[in-house]
Amino acid sequence: MLASRPEGDTRFRNQSKTMTARQKALIIDDEPDIRELLEITLGRMKLDTRSARNLKEARELLAREHYDLCLTDMRLPDGSGLELVQHIQQQYPQLPVAMITAYGSLDTAIGALKAGAFDFLTKPVDLNRLRELVSTALRLRAPDAALMAVP
């Protein structure tokens, strides 16, 4: 027997909106273990993820889908993560990008930030720092997303 719900009960309707409005992150790293770690961590934060192994795949995914956040490795098989940051700044300026690299020198961090990266992480990735970075990026992006939704 099905229980009836009051006509004003919006719990189920609101729940379905929440489930379909998940934010999406693009992860670019040529190391499968790092990609998997990032996918699992962001998935537990209720983000959908897509992954690319190189610049070419990343550009293809960016052209096909909308993303709320991008995490990219500095050194990729077909170029530099800085190239991707510059591409995103030109084509998708509202998309926050964080650089992840094993080469954690101050010069590298400054280069990433000058290119337009939102933030910078070093490998091995500190998961607490990653979660903070992701939460901050999504909070800062929220006003942009709300403005884009206004007719």
Regions found by a protein language model. Give the residues of each.
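Acidic, metal-coordinating helix/loop segments flanking the phosphotransfer/catalytic sites
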Residues: 26, 51-69
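Two-component/phosphorelay signaling modules centered on CheY-like receiver
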Residues: 32-50
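The feature encodes the CheY-like receiver
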Residues: 35, 77, 105
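Acidic catalytic/metal-coordinating carboxylates
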Residues: 54, 80-83
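Short amphipathic alpha-helix used as the core "switch/output" element in two-component signaling
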Residues: 60, 75, 82-94, 111
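Active-site residues of response regulator receiver
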Residues: 73, 101
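C-terminal output helix
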Residues: 107, 121, 125-135
